[in-house]
Amino acid sequence: DKSVSSTHFSIDIEQLLADGKTIKIKPQGYSMYPLFVPGRDEACIERTDFSSLKRGDVILYRRDKSILVLHRIWKITDNSLYMVGDNQTEIEGPLRADQVRGKLTGFVRNGKFVDVKNPIYRFTSSLWLFLRPLRPCFWKLMSVLRK
């Protein structure tokens, strides 16, 4: 395993994945909050085939001539993906198969590895994906409760 900060994303990370290596990155920003908290969590990613992807998977992909992004699959069509961050409501897409670099296999939180096959993770991530249209209401309620 090689741990690399996502601020240093480069062709090297893409090459490591292409070579079949599992990488660990520390996601930056809050687009995948509450799954990932910047500075706390590490995402474990490995190469994947487009045909093995399913709704709810978190994948690493490259936007056209732009940055690498780690978001969740909202919808899959025959040859396209539609993505959403866990802290977002806007759907991004369509993405092509050639933009996919890898898939989340687990993450490290407070020194402990959590596999994406973990039943609690699967349930909460499926529920959060289902509740996408209600996220703004949820965050508004949380801000009121914190006061």
Give names to the regions the model predicted.
Residues 1-147:
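Extended hydrophobic leader/signal-anchor segments used for secretion and membrane insertion
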